[in-house]
Every structure is written in structure tokens, then in C-alpha cells.
From Swiss-Prot:
Enzyme class label: transferase
Positions contributing to UDP-alpha-D-glucose binding: 266, 325-327, 342-350, 364-367
Keyword set, alphabetical order: Glycosyltransferase, Transferase
Gene: UGT79B3
Naturally occurring in which organism (per UniProt): Arabidopsis thaliana (Mouse-ear cress)
Enzyme Commission identifier(s): 2.4.1.-
Protein name per the record: UDP-glycosyltransferase 79B3
UniProt KW Translocase keyword: no
InterPro entries xref list: UDP-glycosyltransf_plant (IPR050481), UDP_glucos_trans (IPR002213), UDP_glycos_trans_CS (IPR035595)
GO biological process: anthocyanin-containing compound metabolic process
UniProt entry tagged with the keyword Transferase: yes
GO molecular function: UDP-glucosyltransferase activity; UDP-glycosyltransferase activity
Family affiliation: Belongs to the UDP-glycosyltransferase family.
Length: 453
């Protein structure tokens, strides 16, 4: 695409689920000849540099994350701390403002993309720059945050769905986000998000109109500003990176579509009793399984936390792994037939693109809304039943998995049929290209000051 070439400064929240989609979008912009300066914590450089497909156009600059009382010394990213300490890390991000201003002065960008650093529009105005609030969670999550304080399970006036809602039994997911510290650390998450939405020049959302168009329209109307869509922005398949040999060998020992793969994201740490119940539920399915989760709270290793006799009983059929795994490559392995997921937004798109049956066990508020979108609105997945405390039993997990894995299951056939339809829509060759082209045109207009009705 021709036209004006621009320079973007990106400053995402210090979490893998935010930095990687920012970088995926940076690759799309760089591919079209635009320049990106990408700010991130030093610890994240090594983790992300292999995703940079255009190192001549995308330049990483690291920021020093200052220490904040209440965080372990050296903390830089969200994956290093419990969710309840997120507000402290956000406070540390606020203390990088001087560094960000110095970078803006040095590289002279045309636009600044940000998400949780709510003060970026103030910085940009001082330099005469435009800002884009880039939303990498679902549009439904943002729509629900715009009308806080209502009754759980009751859609507020004008809200576009009676299904994609937090219900009374989901209150536990909000408790998990409540800060455990008593220090005043500035705005909370809701205040940061709403301030960012209201003060940015434009809102951009990593979604597709086909999936969340009604929520995007709602946000545009509520915020009274243009909402641009980037599409899902999937990374290009990396032909140079293959699935680790240990997983190729292990998965290849099973029949096609027979393995249940469970992963709950980089931030979820289960209580020990819930972790054990998860393991027992996987055992109960009777299917081969691979579980990739962090050691539960209070345990330093997976092995010490496993239920008594579990390893011996599932030997040769099940494996619980406490380290990082190549989730997209595992999902694309022919032996994997079911994905049990927390339904973080990145995992939501990966599950939609996969051939696997989808079972969802959300842990936090936005994951619950993503789950409602997939299970209740699109009907492509099954949600694990829970008690009001948030507890899920081994039986409810097993029932959910078997309801989609058994070939004679009416529910399984329904979600498989719907999943196939939506996967074909999302993966259609022209969809992604069309979104990115239109998005770049809108950015060119924003930089040049051109307006289109």
C-alpha cells in the first residue's frame, strides 16, 4: 500500500498477553513500510525478539521499571506476580513517564499506541501527537466496563447482549482481582481503562466486526469517538520454529483427535485443592491428556502438588507440566482433539482457529465474558459448570470434556458444526488483509489530518 509513511511509538502493558498482540500489529504495519519504536521492559526483550519479523522497521527500546514497595525487587512483568499485585506494577509503569517522554523527544513519532498508561494522551499533547488506545481484550469486556456498578446478570440499557454478561455466580472472578495491598497506588484498572478510552484520539480494537460488531458500535456510541478494528491480527506461522521434540514424541503416541490439552495462561495460579481437582477431572475423562499450568499456590513444583497416587495411575496416558509450552503448535498437532482453556483473549482466537473442540474454565472477569461470547453467543464451546464460590469439581470438568469429545454427543456435534463455520469465517484469506489495509488508511488520515464521513 502506498501513501503516507508514518512512525508509531508503542507502549503496551507489561504482560505477555498485551505485548505480543501489539507486536503482531507492529509486524503488519512494518510490512507496509511504516516504522515502529516498541517500548518494553528489559526482561521481555528476549521473550519477544523472535516475533519481530521486520527488525529494520521495528526497533525495541527497553525501559527500566522502577521498584515499588510491595513488589519483589526486580519485578518487571505481570507474569512474575499474583494478579492481586497488578495495581502495584501499574504504579511502577506510571513512574516510567520521564523515560517515555525522553524516547518521544528522541524518535519523534507521529502516533503513540498505548493501553494502560493512561497518561500517554497528556504526554502526546505536549508534543502535538495523536494517540491510539489499542484494546487487546475483547470488545465485550470494554463494553461491560463502560457501565460498571449495575446488577450482575442484568444488561444495562442499550447494552448489546443479554448473554455476554457477568452473572451472580461470577462474582468470585472479580474478588480475584481485588488488590491485597493497602498502599495508595493511583488509579485502579477501571479508572485507567476509562480515562484511556476517553482521552485518546482514536480507539482501536483487536477484533472483527463479524464476531463483535455490536459491541464495537456500543463503544463508539458511548465514547463518542471513532473505533477502528484491526481484525484479530494473528502472527504469521513461523516455519523456522517447530514443536519441541519431547512433545512431538509424546503426542505422536496417540490416535488423531484423542488428546485433551489444558492450558490456563501465564498469570493463573490455582489453589492447591483446585489444581488437584483439575488433575483428577482430566484423569476421570479416560482420554489421554496434557496439562500445562503453573505450580499451585504454596507449591514450588508440580510434582509435590499432585494428588496421591496420581502419577502412577495416569502413567503412559497423562502428563502435567509446569513450564511454558508452544500452545499454537500443540493445538495444531493432529493428536490433539480438545482444548481446555481459561479463555484469555489470545487463547480465545487460537482456539477459534484450531480444529479442537473447546472447553472453557475462565478464571478472571474478562475471561468470563470471552467465555460467554464463545459458549452462549456463538455456541462454539462448552463452559465448565461451577459453584458460586468459583469451585469446579472433577465431575463437572469431566462432563464438559466428554460432552464435546464423544462422537454421538448432540452438544458436541452442535459446537463442532458452529466452530467449523466461525473458523472458516475468521480464517478466510481476505479477512485479515482487508482489516489491516483499512486500518492503515485510517491511521494515514489521522496523521495527515484528513477526515472521511
Amino acid at each position: 500500500m502506498g501513501g503516507l509513511k508514518f512512525h508509531v511509538l508503542m507502549y503496551p502493558w507489561f504482560a505477555t498477553g498485551h505485548m505480543t498482540p501489539f507486536l503482531f500489529l507492529a509486524n503488519k504495519l512494518a510490512e507496509k513500510g511504516h516504522t515502529v519504536t516498541f517500548l518494553l521492559p528489559k526482561k521481555s526483550l528476549k521473550q519477544l525478539e523472535h516475533f519481530n519479523l521486520f527488525p529494520h522497521n521495528i526497533v525495541f527500546r527497553s525501559v527500566t521499571v522502577p521498584h515499588v514497595d510491595g513488589l519483589p525487587v526486580g519485578t518487571e512483568t505481570a507474569s512474575e506476580i499474583p494478579v492481586t499485585s497488578t495495581d502495584l506494577l501499574m504504579s511502577a509503569m506510571d513512574l516510567t513517564r520521564d523515560q517515555v517522554e525522553a524516547v518521544v523527544r528522541a524518535v519523534e513519532p507521529d502516533l503513540i499506541f498505548f493501553d494502560f498508561a493512561h497518561w500517554i494522551p497528556e504526554v502526546a499533547r505536549d508534543f502535538g501527537l495523536k494517540t491510539v488506545k489499542y484494546v487487546v481484550v475483547s470488545a465485550s469486556t470494554i463494553a461491560s466496563m463502560l457501565v460498571p456498578g449495575g446488577e450482575l446478570g442484568v444488561p444495562p440499557p442499550g447494552y448489546p447482549s443479554s448473554k455476554v454478561l457477568l452473572r451472580k455466580q461470577d462474582a468470585y472472578t472479580m474478588k480475584k482481582l481485588e488488590p491485597t495491598n493497602t498502599i495508595d497506588v493511583g488509579p485502579n484498572l477501571l479508572e485507567r481503562v476509562t480515562t484511556s478510552l476517553m482521552n485518546s484520539d482514536v480507539i482501536a480494537i483487536r477484533t472483527a466486526r463479524e464476531i463483535e460488531g455490536n459491541f464495537c458500535d456500543y463503544i463508539e456510541k458511548h465514547c463518542r469517538k471513532k473505533v477502528l478494528l484491526t481484525g484479530p491480527v494473528f502472527p504469521e506461522p513461523d516455519k523456522t520454529r517447530e514443536l519441541e521434540e519431547r512433545w512431538v514424541k509424546w503426542l505422536s503416541g496417540y490416535e488423531p483427535d484423542s488428546v485433551v490439552f489444558c492450558a490456563l495462561g501465564s498469570q493463573v495460579i490455582l489453589e492447591k485443592d483446585q489444581f488437584q481437582e483439575l488433575c483428577l477431572g482430566m484423569e476421570l475423562t479416560g482420554s489421554p491428556f496434557l496439562v500445562a499450568v503453573k505450580p499451585p499456590r504454596g507449591s514450588s513444583t508440580i510434582q509435590e502438588a499432585l494428588p496421591e497416587g496420581f502419577e502412577e495411575r495416569v502413567k503412559g496416558r497423562g502428563l502435567v507440566w509446569g513450564g511454558w509450552v508452544q500452545q499454537p503448535l500443540i493445538l495444531s498437532h493432529p493428536s490433539v482433539g480438545c482444548f481446555v482453556s481459561h479463555c484469555g483473549f489470545g487463547s480465545m482466537w487460537e482456539s477459534l482457529l484450531s480444529d479442537c473442540q473447546i472447553v472453557l474454565v475462565p478464571q478472571l472477569g474478562d475471561q468470563v465474558l470471552n467465555t460467554r461470547l464463545l459458549s452462549d453467543e456463538l455456541k462454539v464451546s462448552v463452559e465448565v459448570a461451577r459453584e458460586e464460590t468459583g469451585w469446579f469439581s472433577k465431575e463437572s470438568l469431566c462432563d464438559a470434556v466428554n460432552s464435546v469429545m464423544k462422537r454421538d454427543s448432540e452438544l458436541g456435534n452442535l459446537v463442532r458444526k458452529n466452530h467449523t463455520k466461525w473458523r472458516e469465517t475468521v480464517a478466510s484469506p481476505g479477512l485479515m488483509t482487508g482489516y489491516v489495509d483499512a486500518f492503515v488508511e485510517s491511521l494515514q488520515d489521522l496523521v495527515s489530518g484528513t477526515t472521511h464521513d
